[in-house]
Amino acid sequence: DETVNALERKAAEMCGREAAVFVPSGTMANQMGIGIWAGRGDEVYAHVDSHILIDEAGGTAALWGAHPRGLHSAGHDLDVEELLEAVPMDASDVHRPLARLLCIENSNTASGGRVWSAASLARVTGRAHELGLRVHMDGARLPNAAVARGCTLAEASAGADSVSFCFSKGLGAPVGSILVSSAEAISHARRLRKRLGGSMRQAGIIAAAGLYALEHNLARLADDHARARRLATALAGSGRVSVDLPSVETNIVLARLRRDEPAQGLVDELAAAGVLCGAYDRRTLRFVTHLGVDDEAVRAAGEIAARVLT
């Protein structure tokens, strides 16, 4: 499809890579990004709370037979010492799986949408490559990370061997994600897409929305970030939750419960009052600003939440 081809060329160019492949979802893009680098018995490293480890139905093991291993420091930064401890010192040691892939997330959901700095990204991807690992970046919200840093998509994903990002999150398209990498890797990924049932006919109508989003909705992500900070400030003044304001770098706000009460109960209270959020875990509320949330909505949500959470 001509429009799909145009979208793939545009995404690859913006990310500074040779090629790209359009897929229905971010999970599929991530799993293809794992499958091109790792196989049965290989070890794949990712943050213990990363989307790849906990929110993709065990795909790393189920689809590719790879062994996932969680790292505690690989959120919006990574302690390379932890990676050094995890990777076998001797690749010929038959007791250990072969270390193949490090997965990182930018922006990082578990830390509330925090962004990898250029220095951290260069340090970690460089060390991973020295250890013989490939690096896949789950960039579901890579556009948010780039806008927050004031850089390009290529700069926000520098050093990664493959990168996924979504059109249907902050960019506002109805559906679709993309995987970018070298031409050789994407050729392999296209075969994996077919196996996963992700090849689509007449997909130009949804690819067109992705193209529009890249051309018109990228810079406006700064508005979402500003609104998230305003909402975070309103929430921080309430009595039942606390918010780490410096951590609100993009469009995600995590509000930690001060009392021993279930987060889902507060989600229900807020929903009844007209504010929608989610329970990130048992003690944390998660608020996300996006294309459908304007200044008035943030003002109203802040006032209602402050009242409910007092």
Question: Model-found features: residue ranges?
Answer:
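Conserved PLP-enzyme active-site core in the AAT-like
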Residues: 1-258, 263-273, 278-293, 301-309
